[in-house]
Amino acid sequence: MENSGLLFNNDETIINKKIKKIIYENQYDKPLFYDIDLRKNNKKLIYLLDWFCVVVLLVIGSILLLKVPVRGRLFRLNDESISYPKLEEIIPLGLLIPLVTAVPFAMILLISIIFKRDINDFHHSLLGFLQSISVTILLTGSFKVFIGGLRPSFLEFCKPTKESIVAGNPPVGYGAIYYDRSICTESEFIVNDGLSAYPSGHSSIAASCFGFLALYLLARLKCFDNRGHIIIYLLIIGCLITAGLIGISRVADYRHTFLNVLAGWSIGLLISLSCYRLNFSSLFGRDNHISIHSHWLTYWDYHNNNNNSNSNNNNNNNNNNNNNNNNNNNNNNNKKDNINNNSTKTQNNFESYQSPNGIPLNELQN
């Protein structure tokens, strides 16, 4: 792993410590579908699947946001909370998308490629960033379609007239004071936008993108590593402030209530945290700059070395067993030789013995 001053020198030591925490004692302790060789043998296929999922999520989320009608809400014509003027947007969608994508991409490119020169870090950072955007858009679109909500300036989006009120569906509810979208005169797209207050899409996307960038900078620059560089702190906190200001701007131009914005922030920040952790070893630990690619490379080496060590131990044990067997055979042969020698000596001694009258015993036997 290359080191450009933004990384620690003991990256492999950190990874090895984490590896020991995920060594499972037996197969019953392992998670479902846990196979260390699966990712090793299908690295490219798994990454292609990740990118494919990003594209699919972006397409589905965009369709939900732009094409699918939201759940209709009933409203009163004399409701002051939806009668605010429709002001010009402080940050329109055409400015939001380049802002939340270009700035994080430029920072990731600058640090991972220019400074670190680590293509794997760039790949995982970019993949995690796009995963964060795609999941956020999908969730935001789903909430808007199934829950929705009236914008503070909804009546400006609807623009009912006396003729449209008469031609639309009759009012319902106690006192017959609640109307539906059938009395609106604006286009279906604009009315649909006016009913899409919850949650704030600007807030969720901004929090997701700049929240991920804040985690990325925190991991690479190590803001709280006892160095006290205020510029690093300002870079990181600036990401969160930018996301906050984008959300507040939606309250200022009467597009959302503060609760809508708060819901968007919550979705975006939670998704950015989870997607960053999905691609890196931790969120706030000393190893939060280490990608899962580096983690798995070290884990595979550890596993291979462990298997080789076990194989060598087995071979040594077999050799020791063979040596022990040979030693046992030699001992048995030595015992047999000793027995034969003793029997020969006994026979010789017997032949040399004499009877009490001086006649050798062998002659007496004859």
UniProtKB/Swiss-Prot annotation:
Residues 350-366 have a biased composition (Polar residues). GO terms for biological process: phospholipid dephosphorylation; phospholipid metabolic process. Pfam families: PAP2 (PF01569). It is found in: Membrane. Residues 308-366 are annotated as: Disordered. The chain crosses the membrane at residues 45-65, 95-115, 127-147, 199-219, 228-248, 256-276. It is a multi-pass membrane protein. Residues 308-349 have a biased composition (Low complexity). Its main location: membrane. SUPFAM superfamilies: Acid phosphatase/Vanadium-dependent haloperoxidase (SSF48317). Keywords: Membrane, Transmembrane, Transmembrane helix. GO terms for molecular function: phosphatidate phosphatase activity. InterPro entries: P_Acid_Pase_2/haloperoxi_sf, P_Acid_Pase_2/haloperoxidase, PA_PP_rel. One of its GO terms (cellular component) is membrane. It comes from the Eukaryota. Belongs to the PA-phosphatase related phosphoesterase family. This is PA-phosphatase related-family protein DDB_G0271516. It comes from Dictyostelium discoideum (Social amoeba).
